[in-house]
């Protein structure tokens, strides 16, 4: 019989000598429970012992909500405002006779919780649970693959809808484009929709977040966008060049040449995503293409990152990541060249590794970069 996620987590905890996991509201809680309450200044944790019954330790404000989740075999323990939550949590562990010599926590646990916990649990060793939950989350099952495929398909259709306006976007702001794209995603059932839209020279800043830049003729537009479908992410980038109606010119010729290099790097990176290879192979392959074309110093970030419940997860397509490429991994391949004061180009697709190899989840044409109509 196939083991549940909870059973596999507890097995991994025992193997690594971890007594407890303390899971604060985060994507880790979503992964384990399929639910998550709002994160605020109150200590709310899902307590997972290696041996024994799990329980939710939450402020009374969230007690009714959490009880309504109906999580089997999971007790809900509440505390009230004005009480010392850390002391009460320690009391619960003692009462339930749960060991806490080594506790695993997530990298996103706020310092405002961790420091008081370390002070109260003076003899406890706190460790990141990356080798338990992080490792498990990198391998997606068929259902997770299906949800990511649907997220990617819906986001792709949203971009196609927005780009129907073609050169009608000239003179509009980055913010107007981003708002329209997010509306299209939301209309297609995408939650947490977001878009970075970078016009002209702003595209040379890899994670530019402005909204006031103007989309111009004879200039580029870099669009990095995505969202979630039923909890799973799409992350995609495309770069366009808006035709100014003046025939070919030096700006367009330079853009086209650099675009071809980035596209070749993308294809090389995707080609290196083979079962049995290493994640760093993807980065090396893409980076080699750009370096050999003379633009190595303008490719300033890793080639890709894992994707799942979070937009950025493990593993990474980066130098030094020697993770073996195996079925179930999902990650981006997104090489870029950023020329300060001129333009930037990034092309990003999402990949899922099946038993037969890499499957690209976005189908927006990569060669449709010139916007004329």
Task: Describe the residue ranges of each PLM region.
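Active-site neighborhoods and metal-handling regions in enzymes and metal-associated proteins
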Residues: 1-373
